Amino acid sequence: MYHYVYILKTLNGFTNRSYVGYSTNVISRLNKHNSSKGAKATRGYKWKIVYKKRFNSKSKAMSFEYSLKKDRKKRLTILKETG
């Protein structure tokens, strides 16, 4: 089983929000974020996946997710590279 870290961005161009998360099934998780069952921070917005990275171990994925959540500059660099 693979583990993914992903970055979501709002579809609404007026609010420039991003969200970093972890999942083993990114598409299913995106559907939850776009419904009322997503993380509290993502409710009320429609999201698209702009970045995902695959890992073989959960611990490496969680460590990378933590680093993206704590390092805004690193996250913004990835967002700029992905357009």
Task: List each language-model region with its residue ranges.
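GIY-YIG nuclease catalytic motif and its immediate N-terminal context
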Residues: M1-F55, S59-K74, K80-G83
